From Swiss-Prot:
Pfam name, any one: Pribosyltran
Species per Swiss-Prot/TrEMBL record: Blochmanniella pennsylvanica (strain BPEN)
EC numbers: 2.4.2.7
Protein name stated in the entry: Adenine phosphoribosyltransferase
Cited Gene3D superfamilies: 3.40.50.2020
Enzyme class of the recorded protein, top EC level: transferase
Assigned GO CC terms: cytoplasm
Alphabetic keyword roster: Cytoplasm, Glycosyltransferase, Purine salvage, Transferase
Catalyzed reaction equations: AMP + diphosphate = 5-phospho-alpha-D-ribose 1-diphosphate + adenine
Self-association state and partner proteins as the record states: Homodimer.
Domain of life from the UniProt record: Bacteria
Length: 184
């Protein structure tokens, strides 16, 4: 890596704050709002993801509600790809398909519009954070059910000790994260 890239990654890492016992006791939450507030850190996060995925043969970017939208939509614009929101149940206005997910502190359903992915689409999934991999696994199932091909997922943060990267590897997804934290 270049010094510029190392400096950008350090800026990103330093802009992520730790909030204990949020949203429930025992969870050490990674807060990205400081990253978003800092235009250099926010821009660096999008730029580095765009650089990494620039030569992948992609047609769409699926962003995971809600914080994933903050990175996936600008990334889709830079890469000149379509953007597809994957939302929690009941928040999309037209026909959808849905898939259950189970997280460290939440569960529910993830949905996408039935006409958002077409057979043969090469799809990249983007979210702010990889923890257990439950939400991404649900998104992968949705994309594949609609005939899309998905082999990649990108993140700002990987919480490596929660096993998300291993889960994604088991279902054929290569994951890439800008920063990694090993403590929970």
């Amino acid at each position: 890596m270049t010094n510029v890239t190392d400096q950008q990654l350090e800026l990103i890492k330093k802009s992520i704050q730790f909030v204990p016992n949020y949203p429930k006791k025992g969870i050490l939450f990674r807060d990205i709002t400081e990253l978003l507030k800092n235009p250099q850190a926010y821009s660096a996060s999008i730029t580095l993801l765009a650089y990494y995925y620039r030569n992948h043969k992609l047609t769409k970017v699926v962003g995971i509600e809600a914080r994933g939208f903050l990175f996936s939509a600008p990334l889709a614009l830079i890469l000149k790809l379509g953007f597809i929101p994957a939302r929690k149940s009941g928040r999309l206005p037209r026909d959808t398909i849905r898939e259950p997910y189970i997280l460290e502190y939440d569960n529910g359903f993830l949905e996408i519009h039935t006409d958002s992915i077409t057979p043969g689409d090469q799809v990249l999934i983007i979210d702010d954070l990889l923890a257990t991999g439950g939400t991404i696994a649900a998104a992968v199932k949705l994309i594949r059910r609609l005939g899309g091909e998905v082999n990649h997922a990108g993140f700002i943060i990987d919480l490596e000790n929660l096993g998300g990267k291993s889960l994604l590897k088991e279902i054929g997804i290569n994951s890439y994260s800008l920063v990694t934290f090993s403590n929970h």
